[in-house]
Amino acid sequence: MSAEDPNAGEDADAEEEEDIRYFVRIGQTDLDGTKSVERALTELNGIGHRAARIIAQKADVDRRAVFGKLDDDVIERVVERVENFADDVPEWMTNHQKDYFTGETTHETGNDLQLTRRQDINRMKMIDSYRGVRHKRGQKVRGQRTKSTGRTEGTIGVNVEAIKEEQAEDAAAEDDE
């Protein structure tokens, strides 16, 4: 900042803010460009904190860098790592191991993940597997206890206030007699 132009520092900050891409599109999802690479990638369905950190590391990107300020070629590297995530990590870290029809292990993201999960559940329902039957009935699927938790119906309890009001009315009626 100089004496001649008191706003010189503010113009540089304004230009720096204008260089940012506020939305970065990966697949069918718009990611927030004002967040760090790691935080922005977690907005994508199927990518958690650990996966986002691995993607940033494999793409040679600082995970704390602002996503919208990255160059196009760096963003392309990140997109490529997201698409090929299953190749970079062990099989146990992917979200869709051993596909029923193809036997492949993939890592689904975005709408593909939701579609794949829905198809798997519908297939289990159709073949009447144990998990499919539990899904059909709307019960817990993964072995949780159901005796006391997960009840969906309304409670059939005692309304203490109503009883006290009735008792007060009865007592008042007896006093009047």
Swiss-Prot record:
Q: Segment Disordered: which positions?
A: 132-177
Record GO terms (molecular function): rRNA binding; structural constituent of ribosome
SUPFAM superfamilies, alphabetized? S13-like H2TH domain (SSF46946)
**Which top-rank group of organisms is this from?**
Archaea
Q: Which InterPro entries match?
A: Rbsml_uS13_C, Ribosomal_uS13, Ribosomal_uS13-like_H2TH, Ribosomal_uS13_archaeal, Ribosomal_uS13_CS
Q: Name one GO cellular component term.
A: small ribosomal subunit
Keyword Phosphoprotein recorded: no
Membrane spanning residue stretches: none
Compositional bias segments (type: Basic residues): 132-145
Any one of the GO BP annotations: translation
**Keywords assigned by UniProt, alphabetized:** Ribonucleoprotein, Ribosomal protein, RNA-binding, rRNA-binding
Q: Which Pfam families match?
A: Ribosomal_S13
Q: How does it assemble?
A: Part of the 30S ribosomal subunit. Forms a loose heterodimer with protein S19. Forms two bridges to the 50S subunit in the 70S ribosome.
What does the UniProt record say this protein does?
A: Located at the top of the head of the 30S subunit, it contacts several helices of the 16S rRNA. In the 70S ribosome it contacts the 23S rRNA (bridge B1a) and protein L5 of the 50S subunit (bridge B1b), connecting the 2 subunits; these bridges are implicated in subunit movement.
Which family is annotated?
Answer: Belongs to the universal ribosomal protein uS13 family.
PANTHER family attached here? 30S RIBOSOMAL PROTEIN S13/40S RIBOSOMAL PROTEIN S18, SMALL RIBOSOMAL SUBUNIT PROTEIN US13
Supply the name of the protein. Answer: Small ribosomal subunit protein uS13
